[in-house]
Amino acid sequence: MTSAGQVVLRHDWRGGWQEGISELSIPTRDAFLAAPLLERYTPMSFRDLLLLMEEYPDICIITDTKFTDAEVVTAQFTAMLNDAHELGLSYLFDRMVIQVYSPLMFRVVDHLGHFPHYIYTFYAEGFNGTEEALRERLTFCRKNGIEGVTMWSWLWRPSYAVIAENSGVRCYVHTVNDRETAEALLQSGISAVYTHYLGLHED
């Protein structure tokens, strides 16, 4: 979020990515958009993303917000909803998967307006790897319309596949950047893997 509470597309405010911008110097939206990322990439705001999604109807995204505090989550998603409303593009939330990191975050976000697609990612809250813990989280997802869960690839066990299938909730893992590992995970019951490489599935 910018200094004025507007949502832009950046992982965090660490220094060195954009001139004059750091955790100690959080920019306005205009200042952010005026400073190339790593001296070569074009910065984008959430509004820019919406306009891009309108132009290209095959784009779908997973949100990757970095806050779990209820007040900040509320401010962030309210700003996103307001941007979409002002542009007349609220329907584009149908092509977004809202990533949540805990049951509390889900309830905070869902209170603002139920989104069509959610995914529950475990890394922020932690996951002890037991089958019982997985069942509890998948039960929460099923009861609340959350379509999938994501965990670190090294936490996945083939024994989870039956649990996931019985719950009707899909399981995903991150981050996998080699084909053999990805194929093995998919064969063991994972629905999909997160990767940095678009061509991971190609021959």
Predicted ranges, named:
Residues Y120-D203:
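C-terminal active-site rim and adjoining tail of enzyme catalytic domains
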Residues S3-Q6, H11-H117, E147, M151:
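Metal-dependent phosphodiesterase/phospholipase catalytic core, i.e.
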